[in-house]
């Protein structure tokens, strides 16, 4: 049965408009995104099948172009739409990090880093540049690597900090494996960066590692 044949108060779109998006299941939200089903399946049926095939909503949202498009009912247009929606979500979060915003909560840092770096398929090293009152000057993804690591050039980080007249930095990188445990190389890099920054009277406030769960703070783990 097509969704248009359902009672009005059971249709996902109408329920969203009446009661809010938070009241809908993952399958119902996905059905609104899909708009239509395929022969013999409503959009909700197709959405449930997709969630079952991918294993979770997150796995579906972070699927590669190829893995997404091989499923019946999907294709380039749906993949492009999904990527646009996800990017709008990231930019919405980024609006909190406009120049002049203060870092008033470690939770805000974790939320933004998780949303920005968690599901990347390659390792990314990013830097939050701050002024002497810990207000955000700029967030930049400075180095992009492979699934196993990213080469970080400390000289380039320091150069950019001086260009922005930064007084302090928070650095972060993701582990595509999802395991947010610091490696010996992570700790060594952090120590070398901290030492180099001290020579320029700059402060390294923290180094976060982003995995599947909450980003791990090396500062809270006892430093480096």
Swiss-Prot record:
Gene3D superfamilies, per database record: Cytidine Deaminase, domain 2 (3.40.140.10)
GO BP annotations, alphabetical order: proteolysis
Residue stretches making up the MPN domain: 102-224
Binding site for Zn(2+): 173, 175, 186
GO molecular function terms noted in the UniProt entry: metal ion binding; metallopeptidase activity
Annotated keywords: Hydrolase, Metal-binding, Metalloprotease, Protease, Zinc
UniProt KW Zinc keyword: yes
Family of the protein in this entry: Belongs to the UPF0758 family.
The protein, known as: UPF0758 protein AFE_0358
